[in-house]
């Protein structure tokens, strides 16, 4: 069987035995699909070549999703504001005091680290969602569930860091 994804053959065999076909869907509905671009903020991306190197592909996928009628949602981390942490147990116990403050402050609105990388093609019609935990899907971490439901989105393409 052709394997353009580089999966080991045993994985393909297990998938085929489970559902009888490799792909879950034969096609997708663009208007019910969103591209989620996760944590492509200056704090995480910086000028790390391997991360900056994926930006052209992210922009290309975003343009294709938009052109077909899908949505693009940029998801970023907001760790606090005004010196106050949105997740104090994380900042106070998983870091040294200095590193916890650095993470909190650089991922606060208004700090250059909080901004999405300048190479990303964020459009005015795109959605921007901020989270205060690792995943935007943790209850109370973001409004991503509302954004997806209000837009009729039930299929996701996920990329980023």
Task: State where each predicted segment sits.
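Internal catalytic-core helix/loop-beta-alpha segment
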Residues: 109-157
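Active-site acidic carboxylates
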Residues: 1-124
């Amino acid at each position: 069987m052709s394997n353009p994804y580089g999966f080991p053959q045993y994985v393909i065999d297990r998938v085929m035995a489970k559902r009888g076909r490799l792909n879950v869907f034969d096609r997708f509905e663009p208007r019910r699909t969103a591209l989620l671009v996760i944590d492509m903020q200056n704090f995480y991306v910086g000028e790390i070549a391997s991360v900056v190197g994926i930006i052209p592909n992210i922009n290309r996928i975003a343009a294709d999703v938009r052109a077909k009628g899908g949505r693009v949602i940029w998801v970023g981390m907001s760790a606090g504001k005004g010196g106050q942490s949105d997740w104090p147990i994380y900042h106070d116990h998983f870091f040294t005091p200095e590193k916890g403050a650095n993470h909190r402050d650089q991922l606060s609105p208004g700090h250059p680290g909080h901004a999405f990388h300048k190479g990303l093609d964020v459009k005015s019609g795109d959605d921007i969602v901020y989270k205060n935990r690792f995943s935007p899907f943790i209850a109370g971490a973001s409004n991503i569930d509302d954004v997806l439901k209000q837009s009729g989105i039930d299929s996701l393409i996920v990329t980023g860091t």
